[in-house]
């Protein structure tokens, strides 16, 4: 079994760096990377610029471009969507996503398994760039409570009022998908059709999972501890109701990344599990 997992991981590693389509010019050019390098832990301007982030055309509430990066074969049978900084005050989540872009784009190119990675390293730029950084977006909405789970109109407000006691950091918004950032991610799910979604958060130091398949028992030093589902959450919507496995990584610190070696170990563990447990499109 270990041999097969190792082989599968090797296939995914190599596939991440297979020839990819030409990329448009980077979104906002150097100013965006200057802002990210100044705000994020363990992120330099060269690391950000090397990520070759692309303007998706979508905008946040305040008009900031929502950027992404595609790596791998466009016609791959396996598609993985990775998102970071859904909560703007979880700075390390965006940093890890950028480091993983570097790892995904820097592997050998001589293995056949095609994988298409789509990274959205900063889903909530308004929250991230606010002073101080904010969990919510510029409308004060918790994006991870704004996805259209069944009975959202009934359950999400009740959960917010009764369970969180109207915590403003967890306001689900007026309606599902009321926010441009959550609509953007929802559109990515519909158009990209990922077989796996990886959401990077902080600071609880655990690994969560929703949806079909056998969850990973650990990624690096993070062990599986399924914390339950919430109305409007990405895990609830994508994993439970759309049938797309959602791995939620809760880093142990929102303001500091793991060591580079630990980020790489988490990445390799993710690849091994994906190779063993996430089927792509039929060949």
Task: Identify what each model region corresponds to.
Residues 1-8, 15-43, 53-55, 67, ...:
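C-terminal accessory segments enriched in acidic
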Residues 48-62:
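N-terminal cap/lid segment of alpha/beta-hydrolase-fold proteins
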Residues 62-70:
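A short loop-to-beta-strand scaffold at the N-terminal edge of the catalytic core in hydrolase folds
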Residues 71-76:
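A short acidic-Thr-Gly-centered motif at the start of a beta-strand
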Residues 77-81, 91-226:
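Active-site/substrate-binding loop(s) of hydrolase catalytic cores
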Residues 84:
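Glycine-rich N-terminal segment of FAD-binding domains in flavoprotein oxidoreductases
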């Amino acid at each position: 079994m270990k041999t097969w997992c190792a082989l599968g991981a090797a296939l995914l590693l190599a596939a991440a760096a297979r020839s990819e389509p030409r990329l448009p010019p980077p979104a906002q050019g150097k100013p965006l990377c200057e802002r990210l390098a100044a705000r994020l832990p363990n992120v330099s301007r060269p690391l950000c610029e090397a990520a070759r982030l692309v303007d998706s055309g979508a905008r946040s509430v305040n008009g900031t471009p929502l950027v992404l990066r595609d790596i791998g074969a466009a016609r791959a049978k396996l598609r993985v969507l990775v998102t970071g900084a859904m909560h703007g005050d979880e700075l390390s989540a965006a940093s890890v996503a950028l480091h993983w872009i570097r790892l995904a784009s820097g592997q050998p190119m001589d293995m056949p398994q095609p994988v298409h990675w789509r990274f959205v390293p900063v889903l909530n730029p308004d929250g991230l760039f606010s002073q101080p950084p904010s969990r919510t977006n510029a409308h004060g909405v918790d994006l991870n409570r704004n996805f259209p789970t069944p009975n959202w109109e009934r359950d999400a407000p009740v959960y917010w009022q009764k369970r969180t006691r109207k915590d403003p950091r967890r306001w689900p918004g007026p309606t599902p998908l009321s926010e441009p950032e959550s609509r953007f991610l929802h559109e990515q799910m519909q158009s990209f059709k990922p077989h796996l979604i990886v959401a990077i958060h902080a600071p609880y130091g655990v690994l969560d999972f929703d949806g079909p398949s056998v969850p990973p028992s650990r990624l690096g030093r993070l062990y599986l501890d399924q914390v339950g589902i919430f109305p409007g959450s990405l895990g609830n919507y994508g994993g439970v109701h759309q049938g797309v496995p959602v791995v939620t990584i809760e880093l142990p610190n929102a303001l500091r990344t793991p060591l580079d070696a630990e980020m790489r170990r988490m990445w390799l563990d993710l690849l091994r599990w994906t190779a063993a447990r996430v089927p792509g499109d039929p060949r």
